[in-house]
Regions:
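Midchain, well-structured core segments that form catalytic/ion-binding scaffolds
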Residues: 1-15, 41
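Extended hydrophobic-aromatic, low-complexity segments
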Residues: 12-16, 68-70, 100-102
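Alpha-helix N-cap and loop-to-helix initiation/capping positions
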Residues: 12-15, 48-51, 107-111
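Acidic-enriched catalytic cores of C-N bond-cleaving enzymes acting on peptides and small amides
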Residues: 12-34
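His/Asp/Glu-rich mid-to-C-terminal helical/loop segments that flank catalytic regions of hydrolases
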Residues: 17-22, 93-129
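Active-site-adjacent substrate-binding region
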Residues: 34-38, 42-94
Protein backbone atom coordinates (compact mmCIF):
# COMPACT_ATOMS: atom_id res chain seq x y z
CA UNK A 1 0.00 0.00 0.00
CA UNK A 2 1.31 3.45 -0.83
CA UNK A 3 0.53 6.59 1.12
CA UNK A 4 1.52 9.99 -0.19
CA UNK A 5 1.22 13.04 2.00
CA UNK A 6 1.22 16.52 0.49
CA UNK A 7 1.53 19.84 2.22
CA UNK A 8 3.54 23.02 1.79
CA UNK A 9 4.91 22.82 5.35
CA UNK A 10 7.51 20.21 6.32
CA UNK A 11 6.34 19.99 9.99
CA UNK A 12 2.88 18.94 8.77
CA UNK A 13 4.40 16.22 6.59
CA UNK A 14 6.53 14.99 9.48
CA UNK A 15 3.48 14.89 11.77
CA UNK A 16 1.49 12.90 9.19
CA UNK A 17 4.34 10.39 8.97
CA UNK A 18 4.41 10.07 12.77
CA UNK A 19 0.64 9.57 12.99
CA UNK A 20 0.73 6.88 10.30
CA UNK A 21 3.51 5.02 12.12
CA UNK A 22 1.57 5.22 15.40
CA UNK A 23 -1.58 3.94 13.71
CA UNK A 24 0.27 0.99 12.17
CA UNK A 25 1.86 0.10 15.52
CA UNK A 26 -1.46 0.38 17.41
CA UNK A 27 -3.14 -1.82 14.80
CA UNK A 28 -0.36 -4.41 15.07
CA UNK A 29 -0.72 -4.55 18.86
CA UNK A 30 -4.52 -4.80 18.69
CA UNK A 31 -4.84 -7.28 15.82
CA UNK A 32 -1.51 -9.04 15.50
CA UNK A 33 -1.33 -7.88 11.89
CA UNK A 34 2.13 -6.43 11.37
CA UNK A 35 3.18 -4.00 8.69
CA UNK A 36 6.43 -2.32 7.79
CA UNK A 37 6.67 1.28 6.76
CA UNK A 38 9.32 2.24 4.27
CA UNK A 39 9.81 5.91 3.56
CA UNK A 40 10.54 6.47 -0.11
CA UNK A 41 11.59 9.71 -1.73
CA UNK A 42 10.96 12.66 0.48
CA UNK A 43 11.51 16.19 -0.54
CA UNK A 44 11.29 19.50 1.17
CA UNK A 45 8.27 21.49 -0.03
CA UNK A 46 9.33 24.29 -2.32
CA UNK A 47 7.50 27.57 -2.84
CA UNK A 48 6.80 28.71 -6.36
CA UNK A 49 7.66 32.22 -7.52
CA UNK A 50 5.24 34.71 -5.92
CA UNK A 51 5.17 37.07 -8.92
CA UNK A 52 4.35 34.18 -11.27
CA UNK A 53 1.68 32.96 -8.86
CA UNK A 54 0.19 36.46 -8.68
CA UNK A 55 0.08 36.70 -12.49
CA UNK A 56 -1.73 33.36 -12.72
CA UNK A 57 -4.14 34.36 -9.96
CA UNK A 58 -4.89 37.74 -11.58
CA UNK A 59 -5.52 36.08 -14.95
CA UNK A 60 -7.74 33.46 -13.30
CA UNK A 61 -9.71 36.19 -11.51
CA UNK A 62 -10.31 37.88 -14.85
CA UNK A 63 -11.40 34.74 -16.73
CA UNK A 64 -13.10 32.80 -13.94
CA UNK A 65 -14.06 35.12 -11.08
CA UNK A 66 -14.94 33.19 -7.92
CA UNK A 67 -14.15 29.89 -9.69
CA UNK A 68 -10.44 29.54 -8.93
CA UNK A 69 -8.42 28.58 -5.89
CA UNK A 70 -4.83 29.51 -5.12
CA UNK A 71 -3.19 26.41 -3.72
CA UNK A 72 0.26 25.01 -3.08
CA UNK A 73 1.40 21.87 -4.81
CA UNK A 74 2.80 19.34 -2.43
CA UNK A 75 3.83 17.01 -5.20
CA UNK A 76 7.33 16.82 -6.60
CA UNK A 77 6.33 18.06 -10.01
CA UNK A 78 8.96 19.14 -12.49
CA UNK A 79 8.14 22.74 -11.59
CA UNK A 80 9.20 22.08 -8.00
CA UNK A 81 12.58 20.84 -9.22
CA UNK A 82 12.97 23.69 -11.72
CA UNK A 83 11.97 26.26 -9.08
CA UNK A 84 15.14 25.52 -7.14
CA UNK A 85 17.11 27.20 -9.97
CA UNK A 86 14.60 29.26 -11.98
CA UNK A 87 11.39 31.15 -11.36
CA UNK A 88 8.42 28.81 -11.74
CA UNK A 89 4.74 28.40 -10.90
CA UNK A 90 2.00 25.96 -11.74
CA UNK A 91 -1.50 26.24 -13.15
CA UNK A 92 -3.94 23.42 -12.50
CA UNK A 93 -7.21 22.79 -14.32
CA UNK A 94 -9.88 20.58 -12.74
CA UNK A 95 -10.17 16.92 -13.57
CA UNK A 96 -13.63 15.52 -14.20
CA UNK A 97 -14.93 14.00 -10.99
CA UNK A 98 -11.77 15.07 -9.17
CA UNK A 99 -9.94 11.99 -10.49
CA UNK A 100 -6.23 12.76 -10.73
CA UNK A 101 -3.09 10.69 -11.37
CA UNK A 102 -5.13 7.77 -12.67
CA UNK A 103 -5.55 6.35 -16.17
CA UNK A 104 -9.20 7.49 -16.18
CA UNK A 105 -8.25 11.11 -15.48
CA UNK A 106 -9.86 13.51 -17.93
CA UNK A 107 -10.51 17.24 -18.18
CA UNK A 108 -13.44 18.94 -19.86
CA UNK A 109 -12.46 20.70 -23.11
CA UNK A 110 -13.95 23.98 -21.88
CA UNK A 111 -11.71 23.84 -18.79
CA UNK A 112 -8.67 23.17 -20.97
CA UNK A 113 -9.50 26.20 -23.13
CA UNK A 114 -10.06 28.35 -20.05
CA UNK A 115 -6.75 27.15 -18.59
CA UNK A 116 -4.97 28.09 -21.82
CA UNK A 117 -6.54 31.56 -21.75
CA UNK A 118 -5.44 32.04 -18.14
CA UNK A 119 -1.93 30.82 -18.96
CA UNK A 120 -1.64 33.12 -22.00
CA UNK A 121 -2.77 36.16 -20.00
CA UNK A 122 -0.46 35.29 -17.11
CA UNK A 123 2.49 34.90 -19.49
CA UNK A 124 1.70 38.29 -21.04
CA UNK A 125 1.58 39.91 -17.57
CA UNK A 126 4.91 38.34 -16.66
CA UNK A 127 6.56 39.43 -19.91
CA UNK A 128 5.25 42.99 -19.57
CA UNK A 129 6.56 43.12 -16.01
Amino acid sequence: MLFQFRDSEMPVLERLDTVLRELVEETAIRTGCRAEIERTATGKPWQMDSAFQAAIENAAARHAPDAYVRMPSGASHDAQVVARKLRAAMLFVPSIGGISHHWTENTDDADLVLGCQVLADAAEMILRG
